[in-house]
A protein has these predicted regions:
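Active-site acid/base region of carbohydrate-active enzymes
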Residues: 1-52, 61, 80-144
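Alpha-helical scaffold elements that line and support the substrate/ligand-binding pocket
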Residues: 17, 70-79
Length: 147
């Protein structure tokens, strides 16, 4: 979270920013190392993904978005650089993440194939209904097309 002067490599942020970074520069070496570190942590987490790297003692498994880096990042690298060998290198990472989600789904006795069973951060989202206070801001309504 660069807006918070964060120092950890949050996987959700890396997943979201990887396409932009890869568009602007050659990120292959950087993200190859990042993927290697992800894979090392994934082995410790039984197929789950860490929330950040380096994983400094926080052994909770990531939820959706943060963990989805296992599939999105390899796809981003393939999209921008077309390296099939990197995709082959990433296949165990991707497969173990998908299998982890599948096992979690099955453990609940459901087969929804929807990853909605772990904690997510979402600290900036209010998913549980409207707030009693308006957060509109001070911009004059005539300048806002959606108001």
């Amino acid at each position: 979270c660069p807006q918070r002067s964060e120092r950890l490599g949050w996987t959700g942020d890396a997943q979201v920013f990887a396409p932009t970074a890869s568009y602007h520069m050659d990120t292959r070496a950087f993200f190859h190392k990042f993927i290697k570190d992800l894979r090392d942590e994934q082995k410790e987490l039984d197929g789950g993904m860490p929330n950040f790297l380096p994983n400094i003692g926080h052994k909770e498994k990531a939820g959706s978005v943060w963990g989805d880096i296992a599939t999105f990042l390899p796809n981003t690298l393939y999209t921008y650089f077309g390296n099939e060998e990197e995709m082959e290198y990433c296949y165990p990472l991707m497969k173990d993440w998908v299998d982890f989600i599948d096992r979690g789904d099955a453990a609940r006795g459901e087969r929804k194939y929807l990853f909605d069973f772990m904690d997510t951060f979402g600290d900036w989202l209010a998913l549980d209904g409207p707030t009693p206070t308006s957060f509109k801001g001070s911009t004059n309504d005539t300048f806002i097309s959606s108001v």
